[in-house]
Amino acid sequence: MSDQPVNTPELRPVLPFSFARAQQILLLQDESVTVAEVVCVPDTPALALLEARRVAGVPLAVSQVSPEEFERQLVMRYQRDSEEARRLMEDIGNDIDFYTLAEELPDSDDLLDGEDDAPIIRLINAMLTEAIKHKASDIHIETFERHLLIRFRIDGVLREILRPQRQLASLLVSRIKVMAKLDIAEKRVPQDGRMALRIGGRAIDVRVSTLPSNYGERVVLRLLDKNSVRLDLEALGMAEHNRRQLDTLIHRPHGIILVTGPTGSGKSTTLYAALSRLNSAERNIMTVEDPIEYELEGIGQTQVNPKVDMTFARGLRAILRQDPDVVLVGEIRDGETAQIAVQASLTGHLVLSTLHTNSALGALSRLQDMGIEPFLLSTSLLGVLAQRLVRTLCPSCRQPYVINDEQAQQTGLAAGTTLYHPGGCEKCNYSGYRGRTGIHELLLIDDTVRTAIHHGESELGIARMLGDKRITIRQDGLDKVLAGVTTWEEVVRVTKEE
């Protein structure tokens, strides 16, 4: 007997997972069933060893290991289905009824208790298919004391989809963790992973995040449908004057262009659209991202990795030694990255990046708070695009109405103006909205603004100086309200800070 882990990957576990875990015994056999090995702990019952001998039908080679090593072996061996599950999901069809499957699943305490994991795999297939059908960006699987809740984020808003059996929580979470190659035995710490799937012929990238909670693990799946996004400036919903000005900015030879907004406001899509416009054989375009969301042909993309100290700052330094013309930094999070980005722009590079600020003018204050001197900021910054995403009205069921005096006062429009509000039909799943579009504010750093920044003018001072020349996000949104693209309530929802 030894305490060394068995290292025979060609052997597969034979006993049901529930028995193996309860009795702390692993029976491993090859396809020819001529070789049988047992991995157990010193306290494994003799009856369990006899049962393993009976099932194997051949002599056993027994290895004793520590409880910790046994747990590791157990998880590793019973993750046998990870590749099989991936193959099962290689091309998920559209004929699976998510709701019926959830009702029909048998009760079970653990994903691997039975011989067949197919029902839970089918449920996950159906859940993913349903999410893609509704163009959901995220799936939330949340465990509470008395129920399990599945919600989809559709057009930026969470919607409850299903409340399946509470007992399904561990099955769903465990299977998803297996598919994302996470540690199913570790439930005390958050884990992150990803998987690539094909659903209805579409390539879907899924980012998986787990988080321990008081009633079990919560899981969020971020879905990235690589076929659904048009990476060009014309598809962003920009007003024509903003699009033309941004197009001019990104063709400047050097300087910094920033895109600001909260998480989920479409900043990455805007930057990728800009890179797609610039992408040519005459330019060396390089990125450092967290993570790489879209793979762009002809562009060198690097992903940050904190585990090996591959930060934005370190990646940016390395990129600048690769003779780039255009550099994309996924996000400026700290003063070090900001300083390197500014220096890069001053030495002949065009730098594109994002900041988490609510407005375009807020980017000026944020960079100065990070230690960028006003004279450097005024010299390097070309422009700042602030943006939000609003839901667009379903054109099949939107309904016109005439605003009253109170609504006129709220919107600043004339009483009697015709606007639209959501209806509800089969095409929009009775929500009244279908898809999203951007609303924007583009701050151009012209000579007037540059001088104000250089002299340390405040954010409020620059706003007053610009006056009516500044078209805010809310004003841009109001133009889309007048055009019947969205509603005033949607614009207010995403611009409350203004």
Swiss-Prot record:
EC number: 7.4.2.8
InterPro entries: AAA+_ATPase, GSPE_N1E, P-loop_NTPase, T2SS/T4SS_dom, T2SS_E_N_sf, T2SS_GspE
PROSITE patterns referenced in this protein's UniProt entry, alphabetically: T2SP_E
Keywords: ATP-binding, Cell inner membrane, Cell membrane, Membrane, Metal-binding, Nucleotide-binding, Protein transport, Translocase, Transport, Zinc
Top-level EC class: translocase
Residue sites binding Zn(2+) per the record: C394, C397, C425, C428
Any one biological process term the GO annotation gives: protein processing
Family to which this protein belongs: Belongs to the GSP E family.
Protein role: ATPase component of the type II secretion system required for the energy-dependent secretion of extracellular factors such as proteases and toxins from the periplasm. Acts as a molecular motor to provide the energy that is required for assembly of the pseudopilus and the extrusion of substrates generated in the cytoplasm.
Identification of the protein by name: Type II secretion system protein E
